Amino acid sequence: MNNDPNLEDVWWVELDLPAGHYEYEYLLINGNRISDPLSRRLTNGKTRIEIGAGGASTADNFSWQSDGYFRPELDTLIIYELHVDDFAAQGNGQGKFEDVIGRLDHLKSAGINAIELLPVTDFPGSHSWGYDPHLMSAVESSYGTPEEFKELVDEAHIRGMAVIMDMVWNHIRSSSP
């Protein structure tokens, strides 16, 4: 790895890799292994990236369909707060982003014009309300992929529904990078 002489704690590496899926983590001087603090996707606790042709990242290839979306006026918001795992579960506690999408029309017909998601950031373990986040830039993989999260937001916007996210910066897990 290379160190930027102008920025004491900034390290970088440049690799010529063929297109594919890659996982990495950082090995610290003290022997601890951590995920990239800016990870958008994790697999087994390791940062996962996808590299496309010519070395380009494929992370931002999502095709948004909700052109022209405008958030409802604040004084007109009718907010439904939900926990993805519990709200979308079919009695098994395994709710996913795609399951929430399947219930958006029901919420819309009830007059809801905004959903507030309890934390959807990565958390340790298999079940949590998200108030012990591990990485703030990665969605919880048991709910779905970053692309499936974007699809949820897009589908809500297509229906004229705002998406509010509960972010928990003051409860971040002590073992997080």
Predicted regions mapped to residue ranges:
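The feature marks proteins involved in alpha-glucan
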Residues: 4-81, 86-92, 99
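Substrate-binding/active-site clefts of carbohydrate-active enzymes
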Residues: 44-46, 67-74, 83-177
